[in-house]
């Protein structure tokens, strides 16, 4: 995967940050997602949602970033969730690792 195909965006409204992700999350791109989540979790909001509607692939490094962010959110009293998982391979990752519930994975829009 080419890193330039990977995008992370951010929007904020009413005490909530939505991190939008597009492309493939792997060892090369996971640090960019980690940085975006770190910023979101330290800006004083009550809720952080990660919109996965544009994510085509996520490996264990991406999963690790999400689990780390979830732990940070819990410690800070911030609600954390992953929304709009569209790619079957990503849904399988959450299912096989039994992390969907812990990550607050939902099919609804962020």
Where are these regions (language model features)?
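STAS-like cytosolic regulatory interaction modules
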Residues: 1-56, 61, 67-110
